């Protein structure tokens, strides 16, 4: 292989890096690089990695995983390297390396730091482990033994670009700095002092054999620490299993930013000394030291010597960080000789000329390119597996994973198509270039000498890598390869041109002198254009006049160059050397760096970017001279986020100038970004913006107030002066603003710029698009008919769906355009037939390709970019792509690749927004706008990517518009809106100075500038012609491109147009339109002409009735037909995707670009209207929209909200911490109040949930899962724990009470409460506690890094030290919590020892009564805890005059221990209560809907299923459609008995499927869906739903057989379950004993004598004694008769026995005996968990009530949950259809949140189901009482695997259904509450 190829291979590798770091050794190491030029240490040929055996002072790079953006999944997998997920093998590395981990900072930005955004860093141990553990872990890992995280999980996570270690907290772009932990490394070390040089290595330490690596957390960096460690007694040996347990016992802190806050300390836990637990109790002064407090000491010198020797050997071992590539190499061509610099020095590559095919296998070996941890990329070596094992390299697990990934990649290549491979290779090329740049020094930042031999070395920052990855390199090597970097470093170190606050021109500005010719100091070969020289002179003139200004030149005129030349002129002419602060967007950072290098080479420009470690290095080495403390730099280049994150540090300087690029981000004067930057001490301010000041006059004032606060003091004064400028003219406004704003446009200043010509190409839809278009309109006919009464959001969503249809039919139904397995031509034709635009684009691109043009294609929708990318691949057109998902270096590489000279790229795909800022693509001369933006301004920005300085050809703009569609109307109306409503920028005079001319409506710049009337007219446009067009079945669209181009509407740019691009591009109306009456306005006439005709017509006229009826008939027929078709392969969601997407509230898979706008919106025909009406059920409602905040911003806000005391009063601090400085404070305060109120309301509604669940918790895991689920609240699309959030508020509140709010007062404040001293490795006392509390108040708890960097807190040398010394973050968190508890206790004592007292029972009773009355429904929406519930139950039971339904006051799940009193009285009251039920208020019968965040509201009671519900029922019952079909069609040749058996068998199969479908639902929803599904089944037979269910239940009992009875009896005797009375009240032990008496036996015998015919008169099913009534049945029947007397009319029955047979009570009774007989095997649990009959339940699985049991009695349900005690006030009928919601909240509630809802009055019934609570079998609404049921398994009814003997229809195997119907997973946490099937006592 040639040398070039070898160098190339040096950089190719995977996309991930290891999470670990090489340890910082205790001694100072000698040795330089391993290159030939290194002095002294290169002769060590035994060094296995080619490096000095005892290491070198090379800082290890930051933990990162390089994201290969844009890769397909297979490509990403192919790119993944050998790294595990950071736990298995990386834990081994971290244990053996002992480095202190470092989290990536949230603000990891910058061109050299871009990839930090897709990086996760694992936190490794904080102590130096001992060698025994190192060897043990190495051996175990290499032997295949798994660490606590399995290799499988490691492999899975290694494919992603951001791997999260199970023991590390995530460090995504939203991660905060609080998760960062400094790592102990050798990087960025200062030159050692003489004392350090003379310091000897620590003597070997002797230890006893029991001393384990995890027992020591002391640093061994000094002799003092060594001696300290020797005096300590070794702790007992900690086994590996115990270590794992310690890791699993990590507790989540309430202040954690995420649930895994504390994970960053997990690995440290594995290596910390097992010392005595630290008590933070207040120590009494008279406490004496007990003998037990003293540690015994044992010392084994021989063992210590052995340990030291082993440790020394281990230190010489290198660690694999990454494996970059693999090759078949010549045996022996490994090690140091394969480094880049060794090859260059030797002049040959030892591997050159090697031919694998011609070399014998004996001379060939597999070799791997290794990136060594702690060494830069130039030290990468090729190694074989043998050499790695010989050198005892750590991290060998990575090698195994890498080999595995290589095999997977090879497999993928064999089966992948050529297009996929080609795309993958292109991405690999970009990756290759990026890795290659890592071998080049970007900048030398420090110089030092090695401590052993005094050899010079340089601290080098590498290209495309952050400062944190800087490494010390041998001076000889650096000088040989990067001489220029060394010279530049020396120049900077010796420069006299450094900032000084005494510079005269800062105080006394010089007289302005015009620069007529380009100055000599500007780089040779670079020339400023005339208008740029004018701009430079204007900037200098403004500076001399002390005017801060706004440079508002149009995009593409070189504002960046003018600004840099301005600074360089101050530097050279006026000797003002800074400091200058340039705040620029991250996307333009690379461009700014390049321009500074070109135009101002003598200025020392420092890019202040990266994570906190990088910024620390900058502050240490780049900020100031060590000796004089003078500033080193001239200019700081940074971003908004960084400058605000470090605003206190940066705010200490007096800046000579502040420059803000993209300054329109400062248009809101209420944002924290604005306020923070405004506070900076600056001598001059310059705002740079290329976007016209487009919204309102106030935004213009905000910018002017920022630069000149004295001249533009208040908005009120400015508005008074210029508010009426529109009427009186702009002369006065222009005169006032002229000195402060400069705006030129290209046509005025750049005469040489080629013209820009726009053509609108109108194209017809294909037949498929027309079909979908009409289908969407027809589906939404009901919504469209509402007209102005309709919902704006509904109209907008329909428009968006139609826009997607105009783009491509695949956006409506992606499943119809699957290209996998299709031939090349066939796949291409499949794509083309879905879009008329694509047909035209295909012809247009082919022509442009032939003529040598290069094309930019813009689209709003990322999914459309996916389709276009598929098309370009099929056409083999080389292209690049840029959308919001492609960031950092990959973005730069794509731009450079396209703009490179001789580039073969033909197309560049861009999203309209991602491609709108800071991108120069002037090498393209054609722009195709595939779909126009709502706002034409965005399209203008897109066009400016190509039409800018440097363009040599005419720029052709092709805007594709679908004719006679909403799209055409949108374009037309957008032009009018932008002219009429947007703010027009006019020329002020011939100088080109322009300004915003009028105050207007800021809302017009929103993403949707149209109101409801506009949307209605847009929808009607072209619709009538479309429906009249009957040629929908035409063949392929005929597209004559020549004819289309000839007919195209052409808009040539007119240089003489006196308005800006906005007007010149559209030529719709002149400026006079604003001064004339509306009736004379041309634009008004156009608007009327466009919309009047369409708007006058009704949708009934537009969409023909026959077409609507045909569509409806087709849909109904299709619904029925689907029931009998074979199962489809597509899932239920896909089957109705188009239907729901275009019809009832469907929402496609959202794909958003960088701005979050490229989404497929949910269609809103059933959405919430403007009147706030709820949505229909059947589809998930759209998530709550929090105006102005994305989900990511909400997460950051909530995370920061939990960190600060009194958060509602600390919004500014929260905004800074959450990086929301641009948001107005009023909006943030509104959001904070909303967050707080929502938590308070939620906890008020669920105030008893915690105590109730606490009674049933058995395991910590169960408690944690339940807590998360029970208290989970949503704000927007973000879920959070309401209880934890309020707990954080309460725990931090005392700090707010004692801490002064003013910074000056905080400096004087002292914490004077006595505390126990912590066990830290630094001096820590009251002063440090005081500063820690001040830091928590100022920065929030957990923001330890900010506290460390704040010089006023003086904690820099106390916390987060770069070694293993405490305190680290975990210790600080513990200390902070301890101090907060002490403060809380002190505050309470100060207030008089107030304690929270328990409420008296009377108040609870009153509350219950009030709650019952206020709900005016069958149930209080708020679940109660046990104690309150008992009080409620007693109150209601004892209230003789109460007319409230007993269920109203019934608790959710009351403990049985609360039930006291005389059982006889209880029975009497219960009977009376059941009688009162019939006389309860009618409101009690109305079903209610309960939502966590809203008041209960009545459900609409319908007479039939909603269509969306019907569709869902149809899909759920699809597996048994044959049984449904056969249900009412038995074979007439069969006897009556056989036909009856046939019906039973069908119902068994159907009922079983219903049970399977109900499994995934919360208990509160099971009742409703059971009702819906049985009602759906009733449509296939003449029987009603109740009757069908009754037959099904009876068939289940008959099917169970006699053996079930015996088993049931056995189970029944296994325990003593609690007995339940008919009203559900759980009895005491005495009643249980009585139930076991002989009287019970007699009752049972009596009940058995009753015939089945009497009990089931309608079914005609013969029954025998074994199906006789269960015990207590007669008493229940009496209650039934009492409660139901006088009511009749139930289907199939009347009064008396008929009515009884239909009652729930009877149904539950009948089921009881059979359920005892039925043996529930493993299928009951879906294959897992104990069988119900195994004795895991006391009293057997069929216990109706679990009474109070003794502590020794085992009562464990499935999954380790104990069944809870029975509720009081309980009646069986409450639960049959009304048990809901496993978590007692709106879990999955939103899916059906509007179904059956009505505000109607009383007396309405739902399919005759809502007669009375005890007679309502299938209520439509929510239950009268939210009982939660025990989990019902799929095979509960005794049909194993769906097999029914003798069933004529074929049985369905539900578990393996291809549509993936929900089945209870193996480890699903069982519902811990009682089911409605376990209601009655065991007999």
Swiss-Prot record:
InterPro entries: CDH1_2_SANT_HL1, CHD1-2/Hrp3_HTH, CHD1-like_C, Chromo-like_dom_sf, Chromo/chromo_shadow_dom, Chromo_domain, Chromodomain_CS, DNA/RNA_helicase_DEAH_CS. Residues 1106-1121, 1600-1612, 1627-1638, 1773-1794, 1805-1817, 1868-1883 have a biased composition (Basic and acidic residues). PANTHER family: CHROMODOMAIN-HELICASE-DNA-BINDING PROTEIN 1 (PTHR45623:SF14), CHROMODOMAIN-HELICASE-DNA-BINDING PROTEIN 3-RELATED-RELATED (PTHR45623). Residues 840-991 form the Helicase C-terminal domain. Transmembrane segments: none annotated. Disulfide bonds: none annotated. Coiled coil: none annotated. It comes from Drosophila melanogaster (Fruit fly). Residues 39-56, 159-172, 1613-1622 have a biased composition (Low complexity). GO terms for molecular function: ATP binding; ATP hydrolysis activity; ATP-dependent chromatin remodeler activity; chromatin binding; DNA binding; helicase activity; histone binding. One of its GO terms (biological process) is sperm DNA decondensation. It is found in: Nucleus; Chromosome. ATP binds at residues 553-560. ATP-dependent chromatin-remodeling factor which functions as substrate recognition component of the transcription regulatory histone acetylation (HAT) complex SAGA. Regulates polymerase II transcription. Also required for efficient transcription by RNA polymerase I, and more specifically the polymerase I transcription termination step. Regulates negatively DNA replication. Not only involved in transcription-related chromatin remodeling, but also required to maintain a specific chromatin configuration across the genome. Involved in assembly of active chromatin. A motif (DEAH box) lies at residues 661-664. Residues 1393-1402, 1466-1476 have a biased composition (Basic residues). This is Chromodomain-helicase-DNA-binding protein 1.
